[in-house]
Regions:
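Feature captures the catalytic ectodomains and active-site-proximal regions of enzymes
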Residues: 1-411
Length: 411
């Protein structure tokens, strides 16, 4: 029985520069070959004009209405970082960042590159501060670093997710105070604990040895923690029950690992797949092809296209696509007997450096898929394809139909 390999270029959609998008400019003979033998179209990850977050977009792509199931990004980050959540826990996505003396954000990612040993040193400081705050407020505070500037913070006890972010979401704005969004003791306590942790980390960061070393190297200090997306674990019907598919995900990013785990996918990683723009894909693609013998659906997440977009790096984005395609090439013969989906979770135009609401290209190859006249995978060409314009939530039912695992609607 055939299975599906689903390749997802995070933030892969883009706007043209000189008439070409990164997908159009990339030399990707394997993906284009599959596109020429399959059906193409354009995809609104959530719905037309909606600017998706990666969390809500992946929920929709996996076949779950984000307006029904989304309870905040933090819970998915925690699951992806292998932090077990209990009922009532509140989790936040965190960024390690750089602020000036006035508390104005200079860089929301502290220069983006944070070495593992630097992240570990910061984790130790935040864990110590968290323990002290926990004793003061009667809660448990858990901080875990994930990839580069990213991390997760979990509060356990009499807490509430109904508090505002401290992340201003843009450079040049001041670090925000968390405020309760409801009139409850739990929300007030949560906001107080978050604000104290934020303040105390910025104070402690002045004496961090890693920051002294970064200053000597001319790099930005890690002197702020930005919190956003406070949420709790949603109740989600497993993908095996909802779509009758055995599904696996390969991802290096905690958020995507968490969303996949929340919907009941088995989660894997691979050497070289760290969730950065410098990822090497050979082992990840090899693992994906091997897992196709065990699963109906194997999802492979590529983060680098989004990272390069946020950095405004057009050529870097092209390079990520080309490296993935090159890693895919040796397995083309095996793929021809199965289904292959290639798409994005949202557009992150290089010129904008942020998620936008336009549709992204999608292609579906399969031995029995109707072939249209599109011969190149890109935003420019896929508009002409036979899939037309679909939504993210349509993908799983479509795949289930091709695999023959869906129930008939009606008689």
């Amino acid at each position: 029985m055939p299975s599906v390999l689903w390749i997802l270029f995070d933030g892969g959609g883009d706007r043209p520069r000189g008439g070409k998008t990164p997908f159009y400019a990339a030399f990707k003979p394997t993906i284009d070959y599959l596109a020429a033998l399959g059906s193409c179209g354009i995809l609104d990850p959530i719905s037309p004009g909606v600017r998706p977050g990666s969390d809500t977009a992946h929920l929709a792509l996996f076949g779950y209405d984000p307006y029904k199931y989304y309870t905040g990004r933090g819970a998915f980050e925690a699951l992806g970082a292998d932090v077990s959540l209990r009922p009532g826990d509140v989790a936040f996505r965190t960024n390690l960042a750089t602020v000036d003396d006035s508390g104005t954000v200079i860089d929301r990612r502290a220069g983006r590159y944070i070495a593992p040993e630097e992240a570990k040193a910061v984790e130790e400081v935040l864990s110590r501060i968290g323990q002290e705050i926990g004793r003061k407020y009667g809660v448990e505070v858990i901080y875990k670093s994930t990839v580069e500037h990213r991390g997760v913070l979990v509060l356990r006890g009499p807490v509430s997710h109904r508090v505002s972010d401290t992340d201003p979401h843009k450079v040049g704005a001041k670090l925000l105070r968390s405020e309760p969004l409801e009139n409850s003791k739990e929300a007030a306590l949560t906001a107080e604990a978050v604000n104290e942790l934020t303040r105390r980390f910025s104070e402690a960061a002045k004496e961090l040895e890693v920051n002294k070393a970064r200053k000597m190297e001319g790099r930005l200090p890690i002197n702020a923690i930005l919190l956003r997306g406070g949420g709790y674990m949603p109740q989600i019907e497993p993908i095996r029950e909802k779509y009758n598919m055995r599904a696996a995900a390969i991802a290096g990013v905690a958020l995507i690992r968490g969303v996949a785990r929340a919907v009941g996918m088995d989660v894997y990683t691979a050497p070289g797949l760290g969730g950065t723009k410098d990822d090497v894909f050979d082992e990840a693609v090899k693992l994906a092809v091997e897992l196709m013998a065990k699963y109906d659906l194997v999802f492979l997440h590529v983060k680098g296209t989004d990272s390069t977009s946020h950095d405004g790096d057009f050529d870097g984005k092209v390079s990520v696509v080309e490296r993935l395609d090159k890693a895919l090439a040796p397995y083309l013969d095996k793929l021809l007997n199965n289904y292959v989906v290639v798409t994005s979770d949202h557009a992150t135009p290089v010129a904008v450096k942020e998620h936008t609401g336009e549709p992204v290209p999608i292609m579906l190859y399969g031995p029995d898929v109707v072939v249209d006249d599109v011969s190149k995978f890109s935003e420019v060409t896929c508009w002409r394809g036979s899939l037309g314009r679909i939504r993210g939530i349509n993908i799983m039912p479509m795949l289930g139909s091709y695999l023959g695992v869906t129930e008939k609607f009606g008689e």
